[in-house]
Regions:
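NAD(P)H dinucleotide-binding glycine-rich loop of Rossmann-like/cofactor-binding domains
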Residues: 91-156
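Short cysteine clusters
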Residues: 39
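Extreme N-terminal starter segment of soluble prokaryotic enzymes
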Residues: 1-4
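Mid-domain Rossmann-like dinucleotide-binding core that forms the NAD(H)/NADP(H) cofactor-binding site
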Residues: 128-208
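Residue-level marker of beta-strand positions
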Residues: 64, 83-84, 108, 143, ...
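Glycine-rich beta-strand-centered segment in the early N-terminal region that forms part
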Residues: 22-36, 50-91, 115, 124
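Glycine-rich cofactor phosphate-binding loops and adjacent beta1-alpha1 units
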Residues: 148, 176, 198-249
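Short Gly/aromatic-enriched secondary-structure transition segments
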Residues: 45-49
Length: 249
């Protein structure tokens, strides 16, 4: 079977190729991509190249994806053609470092050693494709938020008001944290305004004196570096140098 694949060739250089899908192995599965969301790593790959994301030229990419099962090997159980699934990128390919190569922006992808609840999940019919495309980034949010010992008095600072940061905030609230004790730091006022509508405070780190504004919201604590935020937890959901200029306490 031939299919159209979106390929990464280099910085600001993507293109389509017609590729041949291998025959489905006894333990494997072929699925059709229905909806894919765009990860920040995909955007960075376009802008700056894929080397930092272990993405060499001439590979497929995209990993936040919802699929429909097309064919399963004879040893694959619990799933059938027509079922909608969400792959787990780290285990859907033989090499976890190639999670970004999954092929979520192509027509079809190939899942090796397909096992339900291990490298893919069957989706509830009540969940739309667009909602399901957020499973992968929200799983990152939940993974980190669940490491915190949360109470209604917990003060949390979230660096980055994108999908990962918003997911962390939602999970913290779900576990008992108070919205008024969660503060976002981001350079995008648009993002901060959206989260303000959900009851979260925000500080724009592109503005002068943002550190003092943050301390005003979280309280101040002293450490060997001097005064800093009294937050119980700081979640880095930006991966940028500037936002992490908050002195540790």
């Amino acid at each position: 079977m031939k299919y159209n694949a979106l390929m990464y060739y280099g910085q600001k250089y993507f293109g389509f190729e017609e590729l041949e899908m291998p025959a489905c192995g006894e333990n494997d599965m072929i699925v059709k991509n229905l909806t894919a969301s765009i990860c920040g790593s995909d955007t960075d790959t376009w802008l700056n190249g894929g080397e930092l994301h272990y993405l060499p030229p001439r590979v497929e990419f995209g990993h936040e994806v919802v699929c429909e099962v097309v064919e399963t090997g004879k040893n694959v159980t619990g799933v059938k053609p027509g079922d909608r699934i969400a792959p787990y990128p780290l285990k859907a390919t033989p090499n976890p470092r190639k999670a970004g190569y999954l092929g979520g922006f192509s027509e079809y992808l190939y899942i090796t050693n397909a096992k339900e609840d291990e490298n893919f999940w069957i989706l509830d019919e009540r969940m739309s494709n667009k909602e399901a495309a957020l499973i992968e980034p929200l799983s990152v949010s939940i993974h980190v938020a669940d490491r915190a010992n949360v109470t209604e008095k917990t003060i949390a600072v979230i660096l980055g008001a994108g999908i990962i940061g918003a997911g962390v905030a939602a999970r913290l609230v779900d576990r008992g944290a108070a919205r008024e004790h969660i503060v976002f730091v981001d350079r995008s006022q648009y993002r901060l305004d959206l989260l303000a509508k959900q009851g979260f405070a925000g500080v724009n780190s592109a503005e002068p004196g943002w550190q003092q504004k943050l301390i005003g919201l979280t309280g101040m604590a002293y450490c060997v570096y001097g005064p800093g935020s009294a937050a119980d937890y700081i979640f880095d959901c930006a991966g940028s140098i500037d936002p992490i200029a908050i002195e540790p306490t």
